[in-house]
Every structure is written in C-alpha cells, then in structure tokens.
A protein has these predicted regions:
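N-terminal periplasmic accessory domains that precede
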Residues: 94-100, 142-145, 184-187, 201, ...
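Surface-exposed extracellular loop regions of Gram-negative outer-membrane beta-barrel proteins
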Residues: 411, 526, 537, 570-615, ...
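Short, acidic Ser/Thr/Gly-rich low-complexity loop/linker segments typical of extracellular
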Residues: 46-62
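Face-selective signature of the C-terminal outer-membrane beta-barrel domain
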Residues: 3, 320-344, 375-534, 567-571, ...
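Short, acidic, small-residue-rich periplasmic hinge/interaction motif at the N-terminus
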Residues: 28, 40-44, 77-79, 91-135, ...
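Outer membrane beta-barrel strand-and-loop segments of large Gram-negative receptors
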Residues: 439-443, 485-491, 604-606, 610, ...
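Outer-membrane beta-barrel translocator/receptor signature
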Residues: 196, 211-218, 226-283, 315-319
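Short acidic/polar hinge/loop motifs at secondary-structure boundaries
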Residues: 64-66, 175-203
C-alpha cells in the first residue's frame, strides 16, 4: 500500500505540467496603484457570454489560470470599478496579463443600491456566511447568529449541533481557542456578532485539520481588514423581551471598532459591552411506571405522576475586547500578534413549581400521597476568558510557511442558592461550582507548489489542554450559614490531554478538469484524568477505583482523507470525499459534578466515556448560473461508540438522573440541498436550504457505574426519517431600505431513549441607511411566533416523560451603527484563520474553489 501511494504521488508530480499552460496576472487600482484583492477574473471563449473558467485575486492582487491552447478573453471586475478586458492567446507558453481598473462613479452609486451583498458563498467543500450581510446580526451575539445558519441548531442551553449532532468543533480563526462543550455556550452568547467577519461550515475537513468533531467544524473568522487607510465603526443597541414572566429590564450593547493600515504595519482594535436578558420556561410531565415505558404511554402501569412548571430569567453583562498588529518586516515576511479577552457576570433566576402524586391505577382520583413544593434558584457567576496568538508567515514564489503559538484560558465560577418551600417547611441550600481550563497550541504549516496545478502540504500540530472542576453543596439556615454538607454533590475532577499530530496532503489537477487530493494525519494522544467524590459518610473516594486503566490512556491513530472533484464546465462541478474523524469526550460529558437546580432531575457526567469514531462519505454537486446557485449533496456517517444522553430513575423512585453513554453505533444517510436565487432584478435574494436524512441508533444493553453503584441500561434501537427546511429572504425596497425574513422548520427526530418533537421559528429584520451608508439603523424581531422551544418524549425502565424547555421568549431589538474613516477604500479581504476549504483549494486559479457569491 505504501509503495502504491508513493508511486501515485510521483506520477502526479511528473505528469502535471503537460496538461495546460499558465496565465498569470495582477489587478491594481489605476489611481492608487494598490493591489485589488478578491477581484473577479473571468475567462470567455468565442462568442459564448458564459465564462468557461474563473478565479479571484489573492491578497497581492495576483491570479493564476491554467488554460489549454487557444484564444480567450479575460475580464477583470470589482465592485465600484469599470470592468476591463484583455485578449490573450495561449500556445504552450506562459502568458502574463495586467489589469488597471478605474473607479466608476456611476457604478459606485449602483453599488449602493445592491450594497446588501451576499450573505452566503458556496464552495464544493464548505459554505461561507458573511455576518455583516445578515440584518439579524445587528446587536446580536454569535450564538444568535448561528441559529440562522442552515444545518446548524442552537438549543435552549446554548448547545450547538451540526446536521443533527453535537459532535461539532467550534474554532476561532482556524484554532480550537479553548472552546469545548462545557464553556462554548457561555462564550458565544457573550461574543458580539459584530466582531465576526464570516462563519465557515466545513462538514468534512481534510487531514490538514484536527479530526475532532465527527460532524465537522464551524470556524468563526474574526474581522481584520487590511485595506489602506484608517476606518472603524461605533455601534449601540437595545433589546427587550416581549413575553417576560418577570418584569425584566431591557438588554443593551455598545461597541467600538477601529482598523488601520500604515504600510509596513496594520492593526485593529475592538471593544464592546453587552448586557443580555432573556426569559423562558419549562414544563415536565413524568409518569413513574411499574414496568418499562414505550413511545405510547401505558396508563395501566402508572404508580405516580410528577407535574412541573418553571419560569427562568437570565441576565448578565460582559466586556469583550480584541486587538491585533501585523508587522510586514520584509517582502514576504509577516509577524502578527493578536488576542481577545472577555469577562462576564451571568445571573440566573429560576422558579419551579412541582406536584408529585402517588396512586394506583384504580384510585387515581384519591392519591395516597400528594407532594407539592416550589424551588427557587438564584445564581451568580463570574466568567473570564481569553486567547493570545503570536504567528509568523513567510511567502516566496511557490513556498509558504506559517508558524504560530496560541494560549487560551477560560474560567467559570458560580454560586447558586436554592430555597425550597413545601407546605409550612422551608429549606435552604447552595451549590458552589468552580472550573478552569487552559490550553496551548504550537503548529507549523508548510506549503509547496511544484507546479501551478499541484500542491504539497505538511505540518506539525502540538496541543496541550488542562482543566479542573470543583463543586460542593450544603444545607443552610435562613441567614445563609452552612449547617451540613451534602456529600453526594461533592466532586473534584481534573484532566490533562496532550496531542502530537503530523500531517501531509498532496493534490493535483489533470486535463484542466479532474482534481485529486489525498491526505494522512497521524496523532499520538495522551490523557490523564483524576476524579473524586464523597461517600455517604463524607470520605473522599476515587471515581476510578478498580478502573485505573481508564485513568491514563495513550494511543497512536491515523486519520486519512481523500477528495476527487471533476469540473464539467459551464458551472457544473462534482466532488466525492472521505474522512475519518473522532469525538473524544471532554468537558461536561465526563465531569461527575451533579447539578441539582431541579431536585427531581439531576444531571452529571460519565467518567467512563470512550472516544467515538466516524467514517464520513460525501458526494457534493455545485452548479452556478449568472443569478442562481445550486448546491446539492449526499452524506453518509457511520459512528462507533456515539455518545448519547441517557435517563434513568434513581432508587428512591422520585428522582430522575441524566448522564452520557457510548451507544453501539449510529448511522445517518441524508441529502442536503441549498439554493440561492436573485429574483426580480436586485429586489429579492432567496436562500433555501433543506436536509433530509435517515437516522439509526442501535440498541444498548450494558452496565454503567456511578459513585460506586452499578446501573443497568437497556435502550431499544431507534430509527426515523427526518428533515429540516430553512428559508432566508432579503428584500431591497429602496436604495437605502432593506428587509429580511428567516423561517425554519425541523421535523421530529430520534434520540437514544425517545423522540424530539418538531420545531419552527420566524425572525424579521429591517435596515435603513443614511449619510451615504455611514449611518445604519436596524430593527429586529426574534421568534415572532414565540415558538422556539425544545419538546422531548423520553421513556425507559420505570418512566415515561414529556418535557418542554424554552430558553428565550419573543424579543425586539434596535441597533444604530456609525461607520467612519476611509470606508470607500474598504474591500473584502482574506482573513487569517480562513480554513480555505475542506479539501484545500489546491489550485490557486480557483478552479476547485468555485466562488459562487453574488
């Protein structure tokens, strides 16, 4: 196999130059002589007005095309400039072309008319969403923006899923940045959407990138313009919850952003404050059974019934800041330093009214025991965090080297008080939770293009992450003094992981049509875990007693990737790709801390979780027209040891416990279609996305261990056909007035022990600009139908339960943004941290990276 692989690479390198001649060029501003990056260069042949090929310029304004022998017309264009044409003849020798575009005052005015731009760009191996073009992003958090992205879902607790799976990595500027399942909900809720340039969705990344996250990567690329001059913006906004269970003050946000480019130095600075308020509620209807529950409730098995209604209010303010400098020390040499920091003080108020009745089926009207109580929660937290990066970039001819070092640190401290009123009795409790995580990453990426059609990449990536979590709880008196400790709620856990990764990828292009890339990543992974709890007598015990082999683990594994794409011409392109990925449990999934905000429903992590592996296969098709784009794909994911949430009844018969478990296998076979259309001139941009898939979860019959107890788990197999549809319509009413409607629907789907009901939502937004677009006013209404809720039906040994949770209520926000400085000179710019695509667009001509933005 190794000989075959080596021979294939050698043949690809040797054979590449014979298929096409190289056309190189540069696009500049005729007045300032400044390079124009992201300018479009189209290739026309004969009298056919449809381009036969196209590309965009890089940050130096340069482009490369590979064309067969013949005569062509090259057309260079960019918003606000008159297009320019050049006739070229290719005859087996390199050709050089230079464009000097001039500003067109009429076109600049026209650009104002269509200035809403495109909020989505299609590529075969990823989808890119421009945050600024989404009206709903004004004054919003990153978490709220993610709710409007196709294939992405954000639940009521801030958990993020991609294609129906929470096994997704969230990166910032191409790096993990310390975000994990335990802290990313709070971080993204506090991070202003205005700091994000674009969001990249990559469902099948190549071997160049970490294999973590079986569903793929969501990469947040932060703003860092490098256009010449000095410019920035100031923003302020207010938002208000319209359906509040309590009288809640409005939320607010303010922000300041500045960018500058002074030749050898460019930089940016951003700071903002956000005060967030939201209100929600919950409903629980649980039946305890003499037997095993099923999808349909069997009333003859009921022995008790719990009903609950809860009201929630979340508030909190926080600061978020970013800064960065790039020093262009010499031609092709750049040193950069950047970072962001945040600190917030979230608060949560929760009140749950419970009624628990015990009875027999024949005497339900006269319960033997009727227990009613109210439990109030008042939590205050402190949440600091940040990331710093130092990097170096070298580019010369066909070689590029990127070296970076990153440090991140996030903490979360929360003290929660509980007051439970049951009849004439009142009890007081508190729970103290402390957590901290630190990480470093050192990486080096090298790229070499032996020919215009080929690319070789190799690199090394070292990561080290440490985390610690501590929690304890007490019974208190009315004054808040501790009476005694609640031993079952004590936990002290820590973890250290290290990973050494090496990768190599190689890609080539043949006959100007066929592109192939293969890659291999090897990782040596090490993990050390510590976890302690207290028994009923208060003695500290080791959670891994008798399971020391799970305390320290280390292993070496390979993660291959392969991509084959074919360009049929006339805007048709097809790609087949395969990757192997992993989901290593971390964060709250393995944290044994028990949360008892609801004394009848306790959640904790499972220290015995194992990694889950997936094999992912995708077939993607992309077709572009002048005003329409269609992206369609078929995907198959096979996961071994997939992690699922499981529920079981405690031995007291009244308390439900929730944790995580490795199920045997999980499969998904689906179709994803995304269409983008410009209709009625420039009046309407319509983006429609749809996912339809078959989901199968295998049966589980195993034992689980917690605090010295053995819990048998029996889960039946589940399968269902499910889907989701999302429509985004952007209207341009006048030159300065635009609107947006986003509607979404998701069908019922299965989980390990039940089903999640269908859901739907509707958001509206309006934007009006003044003073030549320097001043923008935005009005948004989120969740117009007040329908964003998660409803589950779950069942198992001894129970059947319906639950509904609502994190937010309907809300309205108003935001004002003022832009200042050299705004006209700004252009879209390639950002550091742009992943470039799952299969890495290994031909800089853009042939395998079709830019289908409008």
């Amino acid at each position: 196999m190794k000989k075959l692989f080596s021979t294939l690479l050698l043949l690809l390198v040797i054979s590449a130059p014979i298929f096409a001649a190289q056309v190189t060029g540069k696009v500049i501003d005729a007045g300032t002589k400044q390079a124009i990056d992201f300018a479009n260069v189209s290739v026309l042949k004969g009298s056919d007005p449809a381009p036969v090929k196209g590309t965009v310029t890089d940050e130096k304004g340069e482009f490369v095309l590979d064309l067969a022998d013949g005569s062509y017309t090259l057309v260079a264009s960019f918003m606000g400039y008159s297009e320019q044409k050049r006739e070229v003849t290719v005859a087996g020798k390199p050709v050089q072309v230079r464009f000097a575009l001039r500003e067109d005052s009429k076109m600049l005015q026209d650009v104002e008319v269509v200035g809403q731009g495109s909020s989505m760009r299609f590529e075969l191996d990823k989808k890119v969403f421009t945050v600024d073009q989404n009206i709903a992003s004004a004054g919003a958090s990153v978490s709220e923006v993610l709710e409007n992205i196709p294939s992405v879902e954000v639940d009521q607790e801030g958990n993020i899923s991609l294609r129906n799976s929470e096994d997704v990595e969230i990166w910032i500027n191409g790096k993990p940045a310390g975000l994990n399942s335990e802290n990313r909900g709070q971080v993204l809720q506090q991070m202003p959407a205005g700091t994000i340039e674009k969001i990249e969705l990559i469902t099948n990344p190549s071997a160049k990138y970490s294999p973590e996250g079986t569903s793929g990567i969501i990469n947040l690329v932060m703003k860092k313009d490098r256009a010449a001059g000095f410019y920035g913006s100031v923003q302020a906004g207010i938002n208000y919850a319209l359906a509040a269970p309590w009288t809640t003050p409005p939320g607010a946000n303010v922000g300041f952003n500045i960018n500058f480019n002074a030749g050898p130095v460019d930089g940016y600075f951003n700071v903002g404050y956000r005060y967030h308020t939201s209100n929600g509620g919950s409903i629980t209807d649980r039946y305890n059974l003499d037997g095993t529950g099923s999808e349909k409730l069997d009333s003859t098995l009921i022995n008790s019934h719990l009903t609950q209604e809860g009201q929630q209010s979340h508030r909190g303010g926080g600061m978020f800041g970013r800064a960065g400098l790039n020093f262009h020390v010499a031609q092709g040499h750049t040193i950069g330093v950047s970072g962001f920091g945040m600190v917030s003080d979230p608060k949560v108020f929760n009140s749950i009214n419970s009624n628990h009745r015990t009875y027999t089926f024949t005497d339900r009207l006269n319960p033997a025991n009727n227990r009613e109580f109210t439990r109030d929660q008042n939590g205050n937290a402190y949440h600091p965090g940040g990331m710093a990066t130092l990097d170096y970039t070298f580019e010369q001819d066909a070689h590029k080297l990127y070296v970076s070092g990153t440090y991140n640190n996030f903490g979360f401290n929360m003290l929660t008080g509980y007051t439970q009123i049951e009849g004439v009795d009142t009890t007081y409790q508190d729970q103290n939770s402390l957590s901290n995580g630190q990480g470093i990453e050192v990486k080096a990426d090298y790229e070499w293009k032996p020919t215009p059609q080929s690319r070789l990449e190799a690199g090394y990536d070292y990561t080290r992450n440490w985390s610690n979590s501590f929690a304890d709880a007490h019974n208190n008196n009315a004054e808040g003094a501790h009476i005694n400790e609640l031993f079952p709620y004590y936990s002290d856990a820590s973890g250290l992981t290290q990973n050494h990764a090496f990768y190599v990828t190689y890609g080539n292009r043949f006959w100007d049509k066929l592109s192939i890339q293969v890659g291999l990543r090897g990782e040596y992974y090490m993990r050390h875990l510590e976890s302690f709890y207290k028994d009923k007598d208060g003695n500290v015990q080791d959670s891994y007693a008798g399971m020391e082999n799970k305390k320290d683990t280390s292993y070496f594994q390979l993660f291959p990737s392969a991509y084959i794409s074919y360009d049929f011409g006339n805007g048709h392109e097809l790609q087949l790709n395969y990757t192997r990925r992993v989901n290593r449990p971390w964060g709250h999934q393995i944290n044994p801390r028990m949360d008892f905000s609801d004394s009848t429903n306790i959640s904790y992590g499972n220290v015995n979780l194992l990694p889950a592996y997936s094999n992912n296969l995708e077939l993607n098709y992309l077709k572009t027209w002048e005003r329409h784009t269609l992206s369609a794909g078929v995907f198959w994911k096979y996961r071994e040891g997939a992690v699922q949430n499981v529920k079981y009844m405690d031995s007291d018969g009244r308390t439900m416990k929730n944790t995580y478990l490795n199920v045997a296998t999980r499969q998904e076979l689906g179709v994803e279609v995304v269409a983008k259309n410009r209709l009625f001139g420039e009046l309407l941009q319509l983006t429609t996305s749809a996912n339809f898939y078959w989901n199968n979860i295998s049966a589980v019959d195993q034992e689980m261990y917690h605090l010295g107890d053995t819990i048998p788990v029996h889960l039946p197999g589940q399968n269902i056909f499910a889907g989701s549809v999302r429509v985004n319509a952007q209207f341009l009413f006048t030159k300065n007035f635009s609107g947006q409607i986003t509607a979404a629907y998701r069908s019922p789907r299965v989980v390990a022990q039940g089903t999640t009901s269908h859901s739907y939502s509707l958001d509206l937004g309006l934007r009006y600009t003044l003073l030549n677009k320097q001043l923008a006013l935005a009005l948004n209404v989120r969740d117009v139908l007040d329908s964003r809720a998660r409803r589950n039906i779950t069942w198992g040994d001894g129970f059947w339960q319906f639950s509904e949770n609502r994190w937010h209520s309907r809300s309205v926000s108003f935001t004002i943004t003022y832009n200042f400085g050299n705004q006209r000179g700004r252009r879209p710019n390639r950002q550091d941290g742009d992943l470039g695509g799952a299969g890495d667009d290994f031909d800089d001509s853009g042939n395998t990276n079709t830019d289908s933005s409008f």
